[in-house]
Every structure is written in structure tokens, then in C-alpha cells.
Amino acid sequence: MKNKNQMKVEKILRLPSWIKFPISKASEFEKMQRLIRKSNIHTICEEGRCPNRAECYASGTATFLLGGSICSRACAFCQVNKGKPSEINKYESIQVAEAVKILNLKYVVLTSVARDDLPDHGANLFVSTINQIRKIDPKIQIEVLTPDLWGGGKSFEDKDKLQKDRLKKILEQRPICFNHNLETVERLQKEVRRGANYKNSIGLLEKAKSIAPNIQTKSGIMLGLGETLKEIETTILDLKKVDCNQITIGQYLRPSLKHLSVKKYWAPKEFEYLKSFCSKLGFKKVSCGPLVRSSYHAG
């Protein structure tokens, strides 16, 4: 057994000077938080402790989290609670739609925890919520950010078909954008995204474009988990090969000591290089910077 002197001491990197969190009016921040609690809804802004949530709240925007606040997976980077998911709130879609109405939103982002416990992996959560929002105003633009919808069935072919069927249900509602995040490069997938798979995620984005060519597709990756520049470029090229239209690239920030450590803080000039790299490849929208998250400045 190792003694304290022999135990490996983890190196924790200091937050660099270029990472500065936006400050917003406390009144606006508290107003949005009160609405979220009163409405009995969840947002990824709160559950994921997003560094931009004060700024987004000040502008009256939020990304709604469907399926409760407990995720059936345990990704090593994510702040969202993990464990046995709660029972589905049958009023959730109505409550989210009411919040959209109160906030007078014109562009809404819907995401969800992974619900591997449900036969449809949560696809109908998106369908019902989109329908409720459209009852309020059919002109509201809706972006969806889904899990990989992978699972069930005995063979790969079964799982592949189920994924496509679940995806088709969502895309039939005609969201303006379909988003699914790769999160990291292929080599680090197993360590970072437990229960997920790089090829399954690329396949989901490819299926989305095949099913609904006119719907914009989008994906995001985090930097600072031990990836190399070459691996990032390869990931970006993989997204371009499946005709992904939009991309977000941001710095991974460790939520707590229980989560994966930050291996590197990428400098602003490196983000600028990657933004240029993506733009030259023809991505229609590129958001790239230390505090960029997949739903930041969406729309």
C-alpha cells in the first residue's frame, strides 16, 4: 500500500487571465432563476452550471432540459446529476411552453438528459414539447440538442435502426437546427463520454442530414482534455464529411474535483486558428472561444 509521500499528486492548472466570466445584473439573474424554480422546469444552464448563464439570463434566454435532472449516463466531464432517472413529469412539455410564453422567446433550445431507461430514449419528450411550444406560436424557432439516441435491440443493426427511427420522430417536427455534440476527439471518447461512441454520434449527424437535408446540423467539441491539434482538425474534418453545417468549440472547465482534470487551457490565438480552419472548410456558422458552449448565442 502506498503511503502519502508515494501517492501521485494531481497537478491542477491555474485559470488563465484570458478566461473571464461575464457579469450581469443580479436582478435579471435572480428573476430567471425564480421563474425556473416556480415553473418546476430544468435548464442545462443551471444543471450544467454553465459559465454564461448570467449573460444569457440577462438577455432572457435559456436552454430547457427535458426528462428531469438526473441522467442515466455518467460522462466524466458533466455537472448534471447521474443515477436512476426520475419518473417522467407528464406536464413538463406544457410547463416549458408556458415558460417560453412568459419569457416571450422567439428562439428556443431544447435538450435532455440521456434516458436509456425509456424505450424511445426520450425522443417523444422533444416531440411533445415542440408541439406545445408551437401551440403558443408556430413562428417560434426551435433548436434541438439530443443525446445519441443509441441503445435497445440485440444486434448493431437493431440499434442502428432504432436510432434512426427515434431521430426521424424528432426531425418530423421540423426544428430549425439539429444539434448533437461529439464533445471530444475519438481517442478520448471512452474516458470522457461513458456510454457513448464516436462513430455512433457521427452516424447520428449523418442520418439527420439524410432524413432532413434542409435542416441545419450542428455539433460541438471541448478542448483541454488531452487532445492534440491534429486530433481536433481530424474531428472537424469528420464533421464536415457528414455535411455538418455549424460547429462550436470551447474550453473545458472542470466542474469539481470529482470530474476530469483540465490538461491544458487553449490560448485565444489557438481558438482563432481553429475558427479560421473551420471557416475555410465552409461551415456556415462557427463559434469558437474559451467560453463558447453549444447553445451560447444560438439562433
Swiss-Prot record:
Q: Which residues bind [4Fe-4S] cluster 1?
A: 45, 50, 56, 295
User: Is Ion transport among this UniProt entry's keywords?
Assistant: no
The pathway noted for it is:
Protein modification; protein lipoylation via endogenous pathway; protein N(6)-(lipoyl)lysine from octanoyl-[acyl-carrier-protein]: step 2/2
Query: What keywords would UniProt list here?
Result: 4Fe-4S, Cytoplasm, Iron, Iron-sulfur, Metal-binding, S-adenosyl-L-methionine, Transferase
Q: What top-level class of enzyme does the UniProt entry assign?
A: transferase
A GO CC annotation recorded here is: cytoplasm
Instruction: Kindly list the cofactors needed.
Output: [4Fe-4S] cluster
- The residues that the entry says bind [4Fe-4S] cluster 2 are 71, 75, 78
UniProt lists the family membership as follows: Belongs to the radical SAM superfamily. Lipoyl synthase family.
Database matches in SUPFAM superfamilies: Radical SAM enzymes
Q: What is this protein called?
A: Lipoyl synthase 2
Task: Read off the CDD domains from this record.
Answer: Radical_SAM
- Residue intervals of the Radical SAM core domain: 57-284
- Give the classification, highest ranks: Bacteria, Bacillati, Cyanobacteriota, Cyanophyceae, Synechococcales
Question: Which SMART domains does the record associate with it?
Answer: Elp3
Q: What is its EC number?
A: 2.8.1.8
Reactions mediated catalytically = [[Fe-S] cluster scaffold protein carrying a second [4Fe-4S](2+) cluster] + N(6)-octanoyl-L-lysyl-[protein] + 2 oxidized [2Fe-2S]-[ferredoxin] + 2 S-adenosyl-L-methionine + 4 H(+) = [[Fe-S] cluster scaffold protein] + N(6)-[(R)-dihydrolipoyl]-L-lysyl-[protein] + 4 Fe(3+) + 2 hydrogen sulfide + 2 5'-deoxyadenosine + 2 L-methionine + 2 reduced [2Fe-2S]-[ferredoxin]
Cell compartments where the protein resides: Cytoplasm
Any one Gene Ontology molecular-function term assigned to this protein's record: 4 iron, 4 sulfur cluster binding
| Paired cysteines (S-S) | none
Per the entry, the cofactor note is: Binds 2 [4Fe-4S] clusters per subunit. One cluster is coordinated with 3 cysteines and an exchangeable S-adenosyl-L-methionine.
